[in-house]
Regions:
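Flexible, gly/ser-rich surface segments that form the specificity/activation loops bordering the active-site cleft
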Residues: 83
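Non-catalytic terminal segments and appended small domains
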Residues: 1-74, 88, 97-160
Length: 160
């Protein structure tokens, strides 16, 4: 299935400081705040986590540099995404054959903000996810560390 309508199913509630989200339990998460979900056809859907979406802000545009059937590697830039707060390269987190980009985003890039774990998926790849991808519990610990660092930086800026 690559329509992104897959219900993420069971999720854990995550809260740290003022950041709150639901993290799908069956997904894998990359250190770069992408999620990866295995599909019934053996491919993997890839999207941005709610944390990444929050850092970028409301999405306004995106583009891909890889065509369907192209071979992609871990860490390869496959495209870019622009939010009101920032623009970011999209790095591949699955090694293999690039299957598709989400066609719905062409008309509604805001799906990334509104349904980042479902219809707001970015692209799909047939292959193997990055070995650094982690389960939901390890990702929650990574979020704890990341958010704590942001809060420490903010506190240091206030002191200056």
């Amino acid at each position: 299935m690559q329509d992104g309508s897959k219900n993420p199913g069971k999720a854990i509630h995550y809260k740290r400081s003022r950041f709150v989200t639901q993290l799908p339990v069956d997904y894998l998460y990359s250190p770069s705040h992408a999620w990866v979900a295995r599909q019934t056809d053996g491919s993997w859907l890839v999207g941005l986590t709610k944390f990444a979406v929050r850092m970028l802000g409301e999405m306004v545009d995106h583009g891909f540099e890889v065509e369907p059937n192209g071979i992609v590697g871990i860490g390869q830039i496959v495209g870019w995404i622009e939010g009101f707060k920032a623009i970011s390269d999209l790095f591949c987190v699955v090694e293999g054959q690039f299957v598709a980009r989400n066609p719905a985003l062409k008309e509604k890039i805001t799906l990334v903000n509104k349904d980042c774990y479902g219809q707001g998926w970015l692209y799909s790849v047939r292959g193997q996810p990055d070995a650094r991808c982690m389960d939901v519990h390890a990702y929650a610990k990574l979020l704890d560390k990341t958010i704590d660092k942001i809060l420490e930086r903010q506190k240091a800026e206030e002191i200056k």
